[in-house]
């Protein structure tokens, strides 16, 4: 009789033996349908590996990672003026409990930029302030000139368009008047030809010229 018997090494080395009286053992295979436990174990392993990797890093790199995790990546989309920087510093001195996120929402910048402004210790001198004021005035004048130039270019373009339209309309009007004049002249010439036309012997139209009236001999003899 063919029976499956469990060997000493386990289910992997199942063998078929011909035995007369032994305990029947059927191979059982367990497949877990729930993968949540495996995912949890995998996540724990990843977290442990990440902690181990961070523990080997130097202190400055750990600080950068923590700042990126807290404030995000340094990618400024808006520049803050010097006056706004001074306002940020003074606001922080007046309200030290105010968070960087709230200040970032006020000024429309990232929290990382607020943190850098507060940590910076650079203060402009009088010469630097004069240079900054001159630069700001020059930039304002340049922007004003660009705006005026763009407005003038726009006006010139509109004028050119109107001029081209008027020229086209005048050409159309001239063409219409020329066509009307040609029609009138053709009608006049046709009427003159018909009035001066005389039929000949062969039945063809023949043009004649009107002669002045001259009295004949018959008119004199009465």
Swiss-Prot record:
Encoding gene, per UniProt annotation: RRG9
UniProt transit peptide range: 1-26
Protein name: Required for respiratory growth protein 9, mitochondrial
Native species: Scheffersomyces stipitis (strain ATCC 58785 / CBS 6054 / NBRC 10063 / NRRL Y-11545)
Biological role: Required for respiratory activity and maintenance and expression of the mitochondrial genome.
Main location class: mitochondrion
Compositional bias of kind Basic and acidic residues: 127-158, 177-187
Ranges where the record places region Disordered: 120-158, 177-207
Family affiliation: Belongs to the RRG9 family.
